[in-house]
Amino acid sequence: DLDVSADCDWLVERTDAFWREWAARCTYDGRWRPQVIRSLLVLKALTYSPTGGIVAAPTTSLPEDIGGVRNWDYRYCWLRDATFTLEVLLEHGYTSEAEEWRDWLLRAVAGEPEAMQIMYGVQGERRLTEIELPWLEGYEKSTPVRIGNAAVEQFQLDVYGEVMDALYSAARAGISPKAEAWALQRQIVDFVCRHWRDPDEGIWEVRSGREHFVHSKVMAWVAVDRGVSMIENFGRSGPLGSWREARSQIRRDVFDRGYDAALGHFKRSYDDPALDASLLIMPLVGFIPADDPRMIGTIEAIQRDLVIDGFVHRYKVSEAADGLPGGEGSFLMCSFWLVDCLELAGRETEAEKLFVKLADLSNDVGLLAEQYDAKRKRQVGNFPQAFSHVALATSALGLERRGMSPALRRGLFDYP
């Protein structure tokens, strides 16, 4: 007869050995290794092994505001979230996972950039229709409960930059090249060169209409810059001259239309002078130095206006019409971006203090949600969240490698 208990013991031991061996491959050996390994384990666990797809979170409709309506289904593969995950895995020594995701992307997109969605199902599904389930009362009576996500229909310009950044990182890490990968990259850069002037719904997936978000324009610049870098550093073939010119045009446009000299900071969008925490990405992708006066002004303005109870909010919900009622918690990823910017600006002590404060928000098994409600002193939003764990691992590495932005760590020359 089959000894079920013996088989169960063997399965537990085998599972334990697998995860311990995987964690031991982490190349980070700094002060926060336990927290970094926990974050990397979360990212690995969010990966659907049959395809390599990486979900944003394993849950749906956990509220950003208890009792509110900002409840979303995150059980899908956002290209943005997945590319951030890929890059942090590469930086910590996990190349096979990056190669699997690269191959998943090629299968999922499988066409022109015009048809590229911002998100897919774990097996590459394209139809993710958003449906509300009114018979469910929701977590702590937070309704509606949703399955699917209408953001799948949005145009988000920044995604092209994030995909190009990740594919560049994969090439630099020595992942075996594929002809179809470079063909896709060329199509993406050409698409961005044609469409970077178009408004979009942006990284925060607003439901109030398209705008010329500064973050989106910066990431359009990233898309073209990484295409140029692929030609210059890896000998790929492409229209180098026209791409360099497009890169310069985008950068000039951001400085001319995205910066408010009177206010002393970059703006949320070309037509909206409000602040947005997504602006903190600018020095992290190599667009502008963190100690540039324009960026210093932006960092300080965000600290003044968007840091509430010690944590960074994406924007002022009361001022920035995003098409939704109610409020939300502070955004943990943006708070870690502030850590990165402070460190790059030479404010290491302040950066480290904030990092420790953020890391201490994790629960008893080291998990982080998307947001934190400082008034209720609890995590909110879908859980665990890839964004938050990516940002923790990235910031920990940055604090060990003082003065090196993520872009510079990937061998990119900052601020061309």
Question: Where do the language-model regions lie?
Answer:
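Acidic, mature catalytic/reactive cores of soluble proteins
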Residues: 1-416
